[in-house]
Swiss-Prot record:
Uppermost EC category: transferase
Gene Ontology, cellular component aspect: cytoplasm; cytosol; intercalated disc; lamellipodium; phosphatidylinositol 3-kinase complex; phosphatidylinositol 3-kinase complex, class IA; phosphatidylinositol 3-kinase complex, class IB; plasma membrane
InterPro entries to which the protein is assigned, alphabetical: ARM-type_fold, C2_domain_sf, Kinase-like_dom_sf, PI3/4_kinase_cat_dom, PI3/4_kinase_cat_sf, PI3/4_kinase_CS, PI3K-type_C2_dom, PI3K_ABD
Protein name: Phosphatidylinositol 4,5-bisphosphate 3-kinase catalytic subunit alpha isoform
Lineage: Eukaryota, Metazoa, Chordata, Craniata, Vertebrata
Annotated region (Activation loop), positions in chain: 931-957
UniProt record similarity statement: Belongs to the PI3/PI4-kinase family.
Known pathway: Phospholipid metabolism; phosphatidylinositol phosphate biosynthesis
Nucleotide-binding in keyword set: yes
Subunit record text: Heterodimer of a catalytic subunit PIK3CA and a p85 regulatory subunit (PIK3R1, PIK3R2 or PIK3R3). Interacts with IRS1 in nuclear extracts. Interacts with RUFY3. Interacts with RASD2. Interacts with APPL1. Interacts with HRAS and KRAS. Interaction with HRAS/KRAS is required for PI3K pathway signaling and cell proliferation stimulated by EGF and FGF2. Interacts with FAM83B; activates the PI3K/AKT signaling cascade.
Swiss-Prot/TrEMBL keywords: Angiogenesis, ATP-binding, Kinase, Nucleotide-binding, Phagocytosis, Proto-oncogene, Serine/threonine-protein kinase, Transferase
Domain C2 PI3K-type: 330-487
Pfam families: PI3_PI4_kinase, PI3K_C2, PI3K_p85B, PI3K_rbd, PI3Ka
């Protein structure tokens, strides 16, 4: 039940005509036709309707108009009651211009809330009510407890707790200031400007303070009070009393945005302050009364929805009301019967026969050999065949799944047979109540994803495709005399103890077992060294069978090396209940590991629910809100690998989202951006519903953001489809005319930026908005900053809205660059990366932050005349920087260019970022270089005539080297070039030390469906660029060679840039 695509203001019509005839059915049976303005509100329409109704028969049967509401059928084919009569006709998304007048019945407040939730998540809430699956019903009820706990937590110390939810402190994870940042201070002190509003006319007064960087906000406020009262000539005792009385009544706010310093963190731990120190700017803070902030905060109420009181439809055995037996008392092998298939659409002339391929998997690992059915003609896909698997039922692990696909086979004479998957599906062998599946089942299959190389898709989603017109496979599982349940932990522990004692009785010469018997009592020093070496191997490094045996035989010692857990779990034979039971006992008491290591246990290789719960407990214990925000994209993605709707990871993320509005904001958009994806629309939709029910008044802000995005989607659809052949001038005229319409002005002004909820988007500056020249017609939009102190941060906010480009890859690349920047900063490397804001908000729809005062290399080169544009003058860029940064600031600009160039050289090389040309490398006026448009990474570079167009590992042209060497002709012989190389080497080795983190982050994204991130083979490119099979010295030599290739091969890049420039000029 995915959301339907937007189709405009009426079904199949992007924009209603300015005036439209609306058919209105009254309660007395009369139909009245009204001519309405497209932007008319429902209250206006109702008033006009009842005036007109007086001219019709039976009007005396009507009550007062306030007794009624409108109802109609929307484009989602849903009947919707319109309680909010301020809504405009054009925003109702009607199927046809028809309105019915009714008397409202039922719980008005709940219906209004359900409509708002349905609008923001993109699907009607009533669709969840119609789902009969007990797992869905139980999840919706049970997750409300998490919502209630979070809301209670927000109100714990009201109103401070509420303020902490709405304006959570934006701080670094550690209070420690890196040495190179500390060195920018004057003996550990920082100059801060404190602003105070002194009159109703917003007159401002400022105080400049010099304070220790580790002062907490209250100390800064106290110092501001002392400075403000200096002219009052108070005695020291009076001053002390004054400070004590007032310092707790004020708070600090960042001038220009909605960031507040509400907690007792050191000043330099706040991100805004740390950024000012790094950039050499004076922080501007506003002193405001705490009560004025608290009085603005909404008091959220949380009401349990009516479905929370419904009786569960779970069957008696699910509720524990019938006799059950343990999985471990079954004494038979697993078998499954394949009955028949329907809706299998194939071309009979191209395909000889079809068959069903099946396998039992644990994550991506097969638990036994795959088994195929007989081949049958396409015209009669019936098998009625029992398939037997080489695994006993008691040996099935908790996360076991049946993977199936209908495959075609085509054979030509004398040629090898071609096997091709037509559709696939997966089924959990245990349901959400730990019960083994049994009986008959119909499974609607999924279309084969792009890039699937195997016949099965074991890490794909489990469950049936909601689209019932897809191929459907009917199958049957064995019935048992009682309901079969996976054993509980007490039984598992008992079995583990038994298997350990039994193992102790084996002699080490026992056939087939000697390599895996526990040998912890024989551990030698070189064994310990080998274990430590295995622990440091990267996640993609293959572990041999001998190494797995070695790990398992020393499993008890491994507890003393907690971070070895992922490797030990990979060594478990998951088709052996003896080993699984022992592993469960080890995990139960395993020491916590760091969050970055725990995240590895959440990717597709670790499906076991106990292992994943352990990982989440580590995150709960050690993951700061800052780090959670940093890794949120991945943590949302790995929800796809959870077996069931209700799990610890869902509860952890939901609780964090409901107690920190900034996390909640991005949590919402990361989920909503995938609601078009049928494989996750139910899971993500249910999670969005629970978030929206408990996020309080922020739902109104999300409503405004979604409404604005819908308007922009509609506008850009018209530009791409109906206006694509018009001139730029005609398109711009249409854009401005539409944006001036009342409904567009209401929707597109006065809401929080989806890119950063601390930034308000005020009035649109229409004269500054434009349609960009690329094929997808992105919009360059410009809003005023309505903050009273906007001139101290930025006075306008520019954002690019894109409809038609998948921005998920850009978003991921920018996130990785941001993490690289953090690593470098913590190691004392200031490489001044610029990971600008980027957010995917839907299917190929997203927003990009515009970086102020920046220009593409091509724009700069074109300013140097024809020679510069055609790359014949390599000094154009250096001359432009000199002109922009005259006198003393020239050296600072060159230094900034050098640092940022070094950072991007290393980052683009490691990530294999392709399609680098002079239109997607930019430079700011102050010299900072940065890259944009990350449509190709992991070495998926553009090809021409079958060859990769880019022949160098990264971009380091003569133009850049001339800037780095301050205009020297023999740039490679200068001290500046040597310094640049040293920066690159240090940056490369710093990232190499954190290779596991980057591999894990990419591995967690495998379920995203990004075209260039389909398998572990894609991620292996990072292993190659970081030379993880080499020593550190060998890796440095490898990178040095890549650097030499880059600047010696710079002429090939220049040739590519020449052709790109010529092409762009031809297009324009």
């Amino acid at each position: 039940m995915p959301p339907r695509p937007s189709s405009g203001e009426l079904w199949g019509i992007h924009l209603m005509p300015p005036r439209i005839l609306v058919e209105c059915l009254l309660p007395n049976g009369m139909i009245v036709t009204l001519e309405c303005l497209r932007e008319a509100t429902l209250v206006t329409i109702k008033h006009e309707l009842f005036k007109e109704a007086r001219k019709y028969p039976l009007h005396q049967l009507l009550q007062d108009e306030s007794s009624y509401i409108f109802v109609s059928v929307t484009q989602e084919a849903e009947r919707e009651e319109f309680f909010d009569e301020t809504r405009r006709l054009c925003d109702l998304r009607l199927f046809q211009p028809f309105l019915k007048v009714i008397e409202p019945v039922g719980n008005r407040e709940e219906k209004i809330l359900n409509r708002e939730i349905g609008f923001v998540i993109g699907m009607p809430v009533c669709e969840f009510d119609m789902v009969k699956d007990p797992e869905v019903q139980d999840f919706r009820r049970n997750i409300l407890n998490v919502c209630k706990e979070a809301v209670d937590l927000r109100d714990l110390n009201s109103p401070h707790s509420r303020a902490m939810y709405v304006y959570p402190p934006n701080v670094e994870s550690s209070p420690e200031l890196p040495k190179h940042i500390y060195n920018k201070l004057d003996k550990g002190q920082i100059i801060v400007v404190i602003w105070v509003i002194v009159s109703p006319n917003n007159d401002k007064q400022k105080y400049t303070l010099k304070i220790n960087h580790d002062c907490v906000p209250e100390q800064v406020i106290a110092e501001a009070i002392r400075k403000k009262t200096r002219s009052m000539l108070l005695s020291s005792e009076q001053l002390k009393l004054c400070v004590l009385e007032y310092q707790g009544k004020y708070i600090l706010k960042v001038c220009g945005c909605d960031e507040y310093f509400l907690e007792k963190y050191p000043l330099s731990q706040y991100k805004y302050i740390r950024s000012c120190i790094m950039l050499g700017r004076m922080p501007n803070l506003m002193l405001m009364a705490k009560e004025s902030l608290y009085s603005q905060l909404p008091i959220d109420s949380f009401t349990m929805p009516s479905y929370s009181r419904r009786i569960s439809t779970a069957t008696p055995y699910m509720n524990g009301e019938t006799a059950t037996k343990s999985l471990w008392v079954i004494n038979s092998a697993l078998r499954i019967k394949i009955l028949c298939a329907t809706y299998v659409n194939v071309n009979i002339r191209d395909i000889d026969k079809i068959y069903v391929r099946t396998g039992i998997y644990h994550g991506g690992e097969p638990l036994c050999d795959n088994v195929n059915t007989q081949r049958v003609p396409c015209s009669n896909p019936r098998w009625n065949e029992w398939l037997n698997y080489d695994i006993y039922i008691p040996d099935l692990p908790r996360a076991a799944r049946l993977c199936l696909s209908i495959c075609s086979v085509k054979g030509r004479k004398g040629a090898k047979e071609e096997h091709c998957p037509l559709a696939w599906g997966n089924i959990n062998l245990f349901d959400y109540t730990d019960t083994l599946v049994s009986g008959k089942m119909a499974l609607n299959l999924w279309p084969v994803p792009h890039g699937l190389e195997d016949l099965l898709n074991p890490i794909g989603v489990t469950g049936s495709n909601p689209n019932k017109e897809t191929p459907c496979l009917e199958l049957e599982f064995d019935w048992f005399s009682s309901v079969v349940k996976f054993p509980d932990m007490s039984v598992i522990e008992e079995h583990a103890n038994w298997s350990v004692s039994r193992e102790a009785g084996f002699s080490y010469s026992h056939t087939g077992l000697s390599n895996r018997l526990a040998r912890d009592n024989e551990l030698r020093e070189n064994d310990k060294e080998q274990l430590r070496a295995l622990c440091t191997r990267d996640p993609l490094s293959e572990i041999t069978e001998q190494e797995k045996d070695f790990l398992w035989s020393h499993r008890h010692y491994c507890v003393t090396i907690p971070e070895i857990l992922p490797k030990l779990l990979l060594s478990v034979k998951w088709n052996s209940r003896d080993e699984v039971a022992q592993m469960y006992c080890l995990v139960k008491d395993w020491p916590p590991i760091k969050p970055e290591q725990a995240m590895e246990l959440l990717d597709c290789n670790y499906p076991d629910p106990m292992v994943r719960s352990f990982a989440v407990r580590c995150l709960e214990k050690y993951l700061t809100d800052d780090k959670l925000s940093q890794y949120l994209i991945q943590l949302v993605q790995v929800l796809k690998y959870e077996q069931y709707l209700d799990n610890l990871l869902v509860r952890f993320l939901l609780k964090k989202a409901l107690t920190n509005q900034r996390i909640g904001h991005f949590f919402f958009w990361h989920l909503k951006s995938e609601m078009h994806n049928k494989t996750v629309s139910q899971r993500f939709g249910l999670l969005l519903e629970s978030y929206c029910r408990a996020c309080g008044m922020y739902l109104k802000h999300l409503n405004r953001q979604v409404e604005a995005m819908e308007k922009l989607i509609n506008l850009t659809d018209i530009l791409k489809q109906e206006k694509k052949d018009e001139t730029q001038k005609v398109q711009m005229k249409f854009l401005v005319e539409q944006m001036r319409q009342p409904d567009f002005m209401d929707a597109l002004q006065g809401f929080l930026s989806p890119l950063n909820p601390a930034h308000q988007l005020g009035n649109l500056r229409l004269e500054e908005c434009r349609i960009m020249s690329s094929a997808k017609r992105p919009l360059w939009l410009n809003w005023e900053n309505p903050d009273i102190m906007s001139e101290l941060l930025f006075q306008n906010n520019e954002i690019i809205f894109k409809n038609g480009d998948d921005l998920r890859q850009d978003m991921l690349t920018l996130q990785i660059i941001r993490i690289m920047e953090n690593i470098w900063q913590n190691q004392g490397l200031d490489l001044r990366m610029l990971p600008y804001g980027c957010l995917s908000i839907g299917d190929c729809v997203g927003l990009i932050e515009v970086v102020r005062n920046s220009h593409t290399i091509m724009q700069i080169q074109c300013k140097g005349g024809l020679k510069g544009a055609l790359q014949f003058n390599s000094h154009t860029l250096h001359q432009w920087l000199k002109d922009k940064n005259k006198g003393e600031i020239y050296d600072a600009a060159i230094d900034l260019f050098t640092r940022s160039c070094a950072g991007y050289c290393v980052a683009t090389f490691i990530l294999g970022i392709g399609d680098r040309h002079n239109s997607n490398i930019m430079v700011k006026d102050d010299g900072q270089l940065f890259h944009i448009d990350f449509g190709h990474f992991l070495d998926h570079k553009k090809k021409k005539f079958g060859y990769k167009r880019e022949r160098v590992p990264f971009v380091l042209t003569q133009d850049f080297l001339i800037v780095i060497s301050k205009g020297a002709q023999e740039y490679t012989k200068t001290r500046e070039f040597e310094r640049f190389q040293e920066m690159c080497y240090k940056a490369y080795l710093a990232i190499r030390q954190h290779a596991n983190l980057f591999i894990n982050l990419f591995s967690m994204m495998l379920g995203s469906g990004m075209p260039e991130l389909q398998s572990f083979d894609d991620i292996a490119y990072i292993r190659k660029t970081l030379a993880l099979d080499k020593t550190e010295q060998e890796a440095l030599e490898y990178f040095t060679k890549q650097m030499n290739d880059a600047h010696h091969g710079g002429w090939t890049t220049k040739m590519d840039w020449i052709f790109h420039t010529i092409k762009q000029h031809a297009l324009n």
